[in-house]
Regions:
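Short, charged/polar micro-motifs that form catalytic or ligand-binding hotspots
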Residues: 28, 96, 142-146
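Acidic, turn-prone loop/beta-hairpin segments
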Residues: 11, 52-81, 112-175
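Core structural elements
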Residues: 5, 11-13, 32-46, 66-79, ...
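Membrane-interfacial loop-to-helix junctions in multi-pass inner-membrane proteins
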Residues: 23-32, 91, 126-134
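Short helix-adjacent coil turns
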Residues: 83, 87-94
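Catalytic adenosine-cofactor/nucleotide-binding cores of aminoacyl-tRNA synthetases and other
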Residues: 1-63, 161-168
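Composition- and surface-driven signal marking solvent-exposed, interaction-prone regions
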Residues: 21-27, 98-99, 130, 157-159
Length: 175
């Protein structure tokens, strides 16, 4: 099951005033309901981006992106602001709830609604926009999660951030 689901359970799922119960089943539920959702979204991106040999550094200007891309990016920035505000108040539970909600929207709405864009046989601005948007969202969310899930965040960072930019800091925890 791992340390990250355990850390997520205690830091993000429980409020400080709640009696803490622990079992393998509880941690397995955290892993399957949240951690695996993020991991599967990340795996979807890496699989199709590598198959399509996407140049992730090639940006698509925001006004040229479809409305759904602008929507998820706006939600990502709102998530970052709300998570930062919660962590500045030492409210890990609220920060975790905001992150979980975003990951749910990213996986269950954005990726599912846009699969055809990723699966198109021809390359183009629409496909590049979909990849770039998903990359930006994953890049943001793993950084927000780093204090909660250091191992998962580091794995994603090394594959998304460091692999495309060797000048990037050595660890997600240094960004």
């Amino acid at each position: 099951i791992g340390a990250d689901p355990l850390r997520w359970y205690f830091l993000a799922r429980l409020t400080p005033d709640v009696q803490k119960r622990i079992s393998i089943a509880i941690i397995a539920e955290v892993a399957s309901s949240f951690i695996n959702t993020l991991w599967n979204t990340y795996a979807f991106f890496t699989l199709y981006a590598s198959l399509d040999q996407v140049d992730i550094k090639q940006d698509v200007p925001l006004p040229e992106r479809p409305e759904i891309d602008r929507w998820i990016l706006a939600m990502a920035h709102r998530t970052a602001a709300q998570t930062t505000a919660a962590l500045e108040q030492y409210d890990a539970h609220r920060a975790g709830s905001v992150i979980e909600s975003f990951v749910d929207q990213l996986s269950n709405w954005y990726v599912r609604r846009n699969r055809r864009r990723f699966w198109k046989s021809e390359s183009g601005i629409d496909k590049q926009s979909a990849y770039r948007t998903l990359y930006q969202c994953l890049d943001l969310v793993h950084r927000l999660m780093a204090p909660f899930t250091p191992f998962l965040s580091e794995e994603i960072y090394q594959n998304l951030g460091r692999s495309t930019d060797q000048a990037a800091p050595v660890s997600v925890h240094m960004t």
